[in-house]
Amino acid sequence: MSITYRILKSKAFALTFFFILFMRAFSADASHVVGGELYYNRVVNQLGSVRYEIVFKIYFDCQNANPGTIDRDGNLAYIGVFDAITNTRKQTIQLTNGVRKEVNSVNYECVKEPSGVCVVQYTYKRTVFLDPGTNGLILSHQLCCRNAITDNVNDAGNAGSTYWSYIPPKNTNNSSPRFKNVPPTYVCINAPLTLDYSAEDPDGDSLVYEFYTPYLGGSPTEPKPDNPSPPPYALLSWNPSFSSNNQVTGNPSSFINRKTGGYTLTPTAKGTYAVGVRVLEYRNGVLLGATLSDYQFTVIDCQFDVIANFNIPGGTAVGGSYAFECGDTARFNNISNWNKSKTPKV
């Protein structure tokens, strides 16, 4: 074996080893985004001057991500402002001083707090002058990447997110709706759950809730663009068997009440799932805009002290509920269980 060949082989090995280390570091550095939402408030001061308060919330996986990456992405957010008709960029707004807090949104009674699940939230607020003109405006933020282990998204580790909101033309005074609650930190397998995805609207507009397919944005090579791309935005690609109306493996399938925002699900497979829920706002029957919640559900095994549950043989549940009419006869199977070792005596 020649000396030249051995040198080249050694260099090739070193490059391969470096590449593997780099990709591992990149995976830990990039795959950390759990979800987010963007909305705004129309603010009028005493002199009649109109401003818009932009509110952006972003969630990170603080269990598996590099803490330095979270701090980097949490310290600054870029909001692109675009003409809603021509898609022309108007300006880019920097949001700083995000307020950080660890969230623990638990939606179960009698559950033992699990380990290995951690979500941190950054909230940004800034009031700026914006002129919606006659076309309206699109506000957007882009960030990459989603958790690589996301089960329902194709190539999730390279798939980013776009969070956007629409401001109607200036002759329409409007503040966007906003969700009342933080999505769940975790979801328990085989445990029926109803989540409150309701929103409130400062203008009293009519609200309608539905599932949607989240948007892509950013890239592994430019995870947090300081000039977000203009609309229109591409949709993420679902893995086989998943869709906007079937985002989490479950039986019965997930269901959202279009009038109340009540979201019921009984997940039957552990995993990580991207979930898109949006609230549409209508005024006098005219669609004004929407607020989008793009969030990651983590389905895990949970330990319960008490599980109260039943089913009806031959019955079909719709949205977690069984329907009966007067005169019907139903037989209930009690499938509750009691973990005596964990339930305190009373």
Ranges and model annotations:
Residues 1-34, 324-327, 333-335:
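Bacterial Sec-dependent N-terminal signal peptides
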